[in-house]
Amino acid sequence: MAPQGDDTVFQPKDAIKSGVSGALFSGGAGLLMASLRTSMKKNNVGSMHVFTHGGGTIISFTLAGGIYRFAQQASANLREKEDGWNHAIGAFLGGSVMGLRSLRFPVILGFGAMAGSVVGAFAFSGGLTGWGRDPNVDEFERKEAMRLNRRRPVEETLAEVGEGRGIYPPGYQERRRQRLLEKYGVEVKPVSADPNVASA
């Protein structure tokens, strides 16, 4: 189970702003869906066909996204908690809006219950961030601790990968010169790209 809530003071958020941004985002998704449906038509239709025949889809998506975000933030502000129940309440109301096109009450409740249960379970289990992650730990500090914990010594990396190809440990040039001298009998003189350093 994901950690639900914490001991910090709840900071209320602007529900209207969240609702408007959710409506714009989901309205764009509805416009994309209506555009895709229009582009799949076999007969040639005009550009306004997206709005005349896909207007219901665009409006449904816009209302569902706006109501979901508004209800989620409003319930969080009223309950003064940030948990999965807020997402479930918002998804229930947003899903009910998606069922309004059928004009049948059981369908409206079914869409709302399905959306609320799926989104609520998703949020309750931690969503995309995972159920085991502590919300009180800073993400940067967590990644730095993981890097320090899992960092391998340079000698081990060099033993597996080898030298060259951008990996130049101390003493690489001398070892390279020695290998070329032993293998091919060619002596390579050290050259520096720095004009201030005199070559030997």
From Swiss-Prot:
The UniProt entry's GO CC annotations, sorted and at most eight, read: mitochondrial inner membrane; respiratory chain complex I
Q: How does the record classify its membrane topology?
A: Multi-pass membrane protein
Q: Where in the cell is it found?
A: Mitochondrion inner membrane
Report which superkingdom the organism of origin falls in: Eukaryota
Keyword check for Transmembrane helix: yes
The record lists the catalysed reaction(s) as: a ubiquinone + NADH + 5 H(+)(in) = a ubiquinol + NAD(+) + 4 H(+)(out)
Q: Where are the transmembrane segments?
A: 16-36, 48-68, 105-125
Q: What class of enzyme is it?
A: translocase
Q: Does the record's keyword annotation contain Transmembrane helix?
A: yes
Q: Which GO terms describe its molecular function?
A: NADH dehydrogenase (ubiquinone) activity
Assembly information from the UniProt record: Complex I is composed of about 40 different subunits.
State the function annotated in the UniProt record: Transfer of electrons from NADH to the respiratory chain. The immediate electron acceptor for the enzyme is believed to be ubiquinone.
The name this protein goes by in its record:
NADH-ubiquinone oxidoreductase 21.3 kDa subunit
Give the species this sequence originates from. Answer: Neurospora crassa (strain ATCC 24698 / 74-OR23-1A / CBS 708.71 / DSM 1257 / FGSC 987)
Please spell out the taxonomic lineage of the organism that makes this protein.
Eukaryota, Fungi, Dikarya, Ascomycota, Pezizomycotina
